[in-house]
Amino acid sequence: MERKKAVVLLSGGLDSSTVLAYAISLGYEVHAISFDYGQRHSREMNSSEELAKYYGVDRKIVHVDLRSIGKSALTDDIEVPSRDLESIPEEIPVTYVPARNTIFLSIAAAYAESIGSTDIFIGANAIDYSGYPDCRPEYFNAMEKALTLGTEIGLRKGMHINVPLQYLTKADIIRMGLKLGVPYEKTWSCYKGGEKACGECDSCLLRLKGFMEAGSEDPLEYEKYPTFYKDYIEKRKK
């Protein structure tokens, strides 16, 4: 019996790698898609390549020049804020890329339709989502309807956006990934483009907080470890 196909958005980050492993565990024939959109943290593209090879899945790279649109610290010469965990804002942060998920999901839907798939998986999260409007449940519900109405295969079978991490905390996601055997040492979350993760941007802080709350240690090396994580590691050693 032919396996059902699914397209998984694979950035190379912690969330998308967990979703990749999850979709594989469900028995899907997974086709990964990664986007080179001019992000300053291009290290994640290397991570997505490593993860695709690790899991033995096909990976399509799509180039989308979002730098030409601008207005994001992830693509422009806008400083990525360094702060502590308590100061992560609830409003839309400067790392928001205008309509990124809408663009990515539209392209993923086109790819899915081309291979006869009606399932798209994305690693978005509505709890530790750092204020992004295109990570909310109501957004994905609306986008799923649009892709169903806007594709030929959607009109026949329906298009499904699967967001399995939607209501999980970062700690829950990490626990899930560890059970699935996700090689988190191959992932990359930092918003900055250094050799090591910075340990100060929102993404690094949420990741380290997640590992701490999951009762595990992050296998990545950081330029700077926040005080809460250093205290946690010291307690683990005792």
UniProtKB/Swiss-Prot annotation:
Binding site for ATP: L10, S11, G12, G13, L14, D15, S16, S17, T18, V19, L20
Keywords from the UniProt entry: ATP-binding, Ligase, Metal-binding, Nucleotide-binding, Zinc
EC number: 6.3.4.20
Pathway given in the UniProt record: Purine metabolism; 7-cyano-7-deazaguanine biosynthesis
UniProt-annotated binding residues for Zn(2+): C190, C198, C201, C204
Disulfide feature: none
Keyword Ligase among UniProt keywords: yes
Cofactor(s) the protein needs: Zn(2+)
Molecular function in Gene Ontology: ATP binding; ligase activity, forming carbon-nitrogen bonds; zinc ion binding
Catalytic reactions on record: 7-carboxy-7-deazaguanine + NH4(+) + ATP = 7-cyano-7-deazaguanine + ADP + phosphate + H2O + H(+)
SUPFAM superfamilies named among the record's database cross-references: Adenine nucleotide alpha hydrolases-like (SSF52402)
UniProt cofactor note: Binds 1 zinc ion per subunit.
Enzyme class: ligase
PANTHER family assigned: 7-CYANO-7-DEAZAGUANINE SYNTHASE
Entry function: Catalyzes the ATP-dependent conversion of 7-carboxy-7-deazaguanine (CDG) to 7-cyano-7-deazaguanine (preQ(0)).
Family membership: Belongs to the QueC family.
Name of the molecule in the record: 7-cyano-7-deazaguanine synthase
Native source species: Thermoplasma acidophilum (strain ATCC 25905 / DSM 1728 / JCM 9062 / NBRC 15155 / AMRC-C165)
GN (gene name): queC
